[in-house]
Amino acid sequence: MSRRLRRTKIVTTLGPATDRDNNLEKVIAAGANVVRMNFSHGSPEDHKMRADKVREIAAKLGRHVAILGDLQGPKIRVSTFKEGKVFLNIGDKFLLDANLGKGEGDKEKVGIDYKGLPADVVPGDILLLDDGRVQLKVLEVQGMKVFTEVTVGGPLSNNKGINKLGGGLSAEALTEKDKADIQTAALIGVDYLAVSFPRCGEDLNYARRLARDAGCDAKIVAKVERAEAVCDQNAMDDIILASDVVMVARGDLGVEIGDPELVGIQKALIRRARQLNRAVITATQMMESMITNPMPTRAEVMDVANAVLDGTDAVMLSAETAAGQYPSETVAAMARVCLGAEKIPSINVSKHRLDVQFDNVEEAIAMSAMYAANHLKGVTAIITMTESGRTALMTSRISSGLPIFAMSRHERTLNLTALYRGVTPVHFDSAADGVVAAHEAVNLLRDKGYLVSGDLVIVTQGDVMSTVGSTNTTRILTVE
């Protein structure tokens, strides 16, 4: 097999396109590492069926594929129109009325499903409808009515989203539907659970408590899509530290903070998440044109490549695989771009946290292993023998061109590490401990074709294989 492994992972969204023509198997075979189930669409039965199919195919192909359940979150939308759609011109007066019923909207007014909107806005605020395609300036608020003037005109149809420029809408991050979907996530046994529109760390802590109460021990993903989540370093850190994974959800975030600010925020989020030992997913419109075209645009290629250069763990596909005409081709194209970007030498340079003091032995071992790996001539791989996947995560926070093999007896741990940049999960179960187990792990990787005789490898492990958090040893071994 090729000695070169793709380091950046691919998250693919399931939907009607992956339900037909054996596309799900094709998508996983093409390189999907994580599948996303969007709880905004479909029934619990649909999600359970898809999850079962993913696990069946992954086992058949000998892959470890993580399952991510994505909660819908609060959807702040206009209601519906009598004719289904209206066209608003610049200068038109337009009323958002929280008391107006469904199907009563027209060119002068429409209902809103978020009844707290009038309390969240003041004259002068800019409301962005349909991802900013239509923009309204608030003139006055009277009771449950928000009087506005159209500043950017265009068509407006049923159930389009509402954002406030600069953020500040106070809708709670978890709805009753989300709480029901957490039960579904627990039933399915998702590996990751994504929380939409969190305002602060406490929203994520609340989601984690609800998940635990439901019997779901999934890692929590913070979808960063509100302006207040990135308004300063403290707000950003609050979100990151309360999560296990950060998703740079560029759609709603870009609408709220403005597209020109998005580039810097993406880079800052990725950099800070890595510093705080969190994984990162970069999402939204990464290969949007491939919904209907068999090849990506040059701009999309550059977007994916730049996310790789930023240090993201994973790049995500949404409608491209859920509803597109070329789901497996899109995954294959994204994989090629990732591999191309990973050839650039600068992404393997690391400062190794030389100015940081570590809080625990596990992190110290992970960092020392990576320092040795990047500075000892001839090292070809890092092997982390792990119960929880934590050591694999921490080693992957340090930039390196070397593969990291997460070796565990636990299927869930292997699925979790499928998301981490540069980490290849490999099932390994041994009754031995210490150096005997280390040699067994090295021999297994050699037999699988990942290593060859004479390779120099670095192994991290604990004294006892079955104890979580016990990593305390680094070994340097030569493959026999």
Curated annotation (Swiss-Prot):
Gene Ontology biological process terms, A to Z = glycolytic process
Q: Where does Mg(2+) bind?
A: E225, D252
Metal-binding as a keyword? yes
Q: Where does substrate bind?
A: R36, K223, G251, D252, T284
For this protein, what is the EC number?
2.7.1.40
Keywords in alphabetical order:
Allosteric enzyme, ATP-binding, Glycolysis, Kinase, Magnesium, Metal-binding, Nucleotide-binding, Pyruvate, Transferase
Question: What's the record's pH-dependence note?
Answer: Optimum pH is 4.0-6.8.
Question: Which reactions is this enzyme annotated as catalysing?
Answer: pyruvate + ATP = phosphoenolpyruvate + ADP + H(+)
Q: Is the Kinase keyword given for this protein? A: yes
Q: Which cofactors, if any, are listed as required? A: Mg(2+); K(+)
Gene Ontology MF terms = ATP binding; kinase activity; magnesium ion binding; potassium ion binding; pyruvate kinase activity
Q: Which CDD domains match?
A: Pyruvate_Kinase
Spell out the activity regulation: Allosterically activated by AMP and by several sugar phosphates. Belongs to type II PK.
Cellular-component GO terms for this entry: cytoplasm; cytosol
**Where, by residue number, does K(+) bind?**
N38, S40, D70
The biological pathway it contributes to is:
Carbohydrate degradation; glycolysis; pyruvate from D-glyceraldehyde 3-phosphate: step 5/5
Q: Which residues are tagged with the site Transition state stabilizer?
A: K223
- Gene3D superfamilies in the cross-refs: Phosphoenolpyruvate-binding domains, PK beta-barrel domain-like, Pyruvate kinase, C-terminal domain
Under the subunit heading, UniProt states: Homotetramer.
Q: What does this protein do?
A: Catalyzes the formation of pyruvate in the last step of glycolysis, it is irreversible under physiological conditions. The reaction is critical for the control of metabolic flux in the second part of glycolysis.
Q: Per its record, how is this protein called by name?
A: Pyruvate kinase II
Give the source species. Salmonella typhimurium (strain LT2 / SGSC1412 / ATCC 700720)
